[in-house]
Amino acid sequence: TVYVYFDTLSNDIQRIKAFYNVRFFRNDIQGKCDSLHYNVADSMVYMRDEPVIWAEDSQLTGDSINIKVKEQTIDNMLMHPNAFVIQQDSIKGFNQVKGKQITAFFKDNEIDNMFNEGNAETIYWLRDDDGSLIGINFSQSATMDIKIKDNQISNIKYYKNIKETLYPEEQLKDNMEYLKGFLWQEDIKPRREEF
């Protein structure tokens, strides 16, 4: 069941358009934007005007977000331009993926992998098997293919113009653990009781 809140609705047989303070809630995914269009013919959801999606521990943003739906589940999600994915690693840490365009591919309603194109950047907190912090990895490349396992980054393949640095926690300076444009928006995440 998906719960949706909006101020204005335009509805015809093939398209649903919701405007102004659009919010939706489903147990495994929540979202917010100012303009949402659903096209029945191609099963596409188009989110505009400061769209934000929360899926499990991840927050996904971009100037626009396009979602492909198959059999009532998300197949893939395109965030562009200014795409940014943030995943809470711990109370203190946030894994981050940033680029001009990020396509997230879903499996069983969870992000399975992401393809990051154009000025791709990541920050992720590298931990050993017992959860102890090894360091914080900063990387940049033209494109990246990022595999996700158990809602955590498990592998990254870098392509072209690769720069990567691993910093022990004690070598971090103020705000080094955040990519430019970082904005954690947990406080505006839709909750079930709002609907």
Q: Where on the chain are the PLM-derived regions?
A:
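Structural signature for solvent-exposed beta-strand/loop edge elements and short helix-capping sites
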Residues: 1-195
